[in-house]
Amino acid sequence: MKVVFLEDVKGRGKKGEIKEVPDGYANNFLIKNKKAEPATGKNLGAVKGRQKAEEKAAAEELAEARKLADFFANEKTVVELTGKSGTDGRLFGAVSTKQIAAALEKQYQIKIDKRKMELNQPIHALGYTDVPVKLHREVTAQLRVHVSEG
């Protein structure tokens, strides 16, 4: 029996795939547990429509990420932070991705999850630092952060 998978089933198929499976397995497990539905003309049309909508949403997400990357590439886009430091320019404490994300939201009204910032170590010194931000699977941008004496 041909079925359209509604979700990933380990060892059998991924969501949206159309595969031939044994009749008993399809009726007694896949269809009963709503993991698949029979591959009829109506169901195939619905799957194609869903796939098209998902592709469109993914393309819009990628375009939005590229637009944000261009905004970050602008030299005027700098996240300003302040901190106390010693005489040698080293901070007392550090600037973390959480603080950078909060300052970015406060200054530019752009909300980015702190886990998307790929900062290997917190910032311990005054001055400018480029922080890589993974906006999408295919898009990584550099965000300029300026830490000054506060």
Swiss-Prot record:
Cellular component annotations (GO), alphabetically ordered: ribonucleoprotein complex; ribosome
Gene3D superfamilies: Ribosomal protein L9, C-terminal domain, Ribosomal protein L9, N-terminal domain
Keywords for the protein's UniProt record, in alphabetical order: Ribonucleoprotein, Ribosomal protein, RNA-binding, rRNA-binding
UniProt keyword annotation of S-adenosyl-L-methionine present: no
GO molecular function: rRNA binding; structural constituent of ribosome
Regions crossing the membrane: none
Source organism phylogeny: Bacteria, Bacillati, Bacillota, Bacilli, Lactobacillales
Gene: rplI
Function: Binds to the 23S rRNA.
Name this protein carries in UniProt: Large ribosomal subunit protein bL9
GO BP terms: translation
Family: Belongs to the bacterial ribosomal protein bL9 family.
InterPro entries in the cross-refs: Ribosomal_bL9, Ribosomal_bL9/RNase_H1_N, Ribosomal_bL9_bac/chp, Ribosomal_bL9_C, Ribosomal_bL9_C_sf, Ribosomal_bL9_N, Ribosomal_bL9_N_sf
Signal peptide: none
Keyword Mitochondrion on entry: no
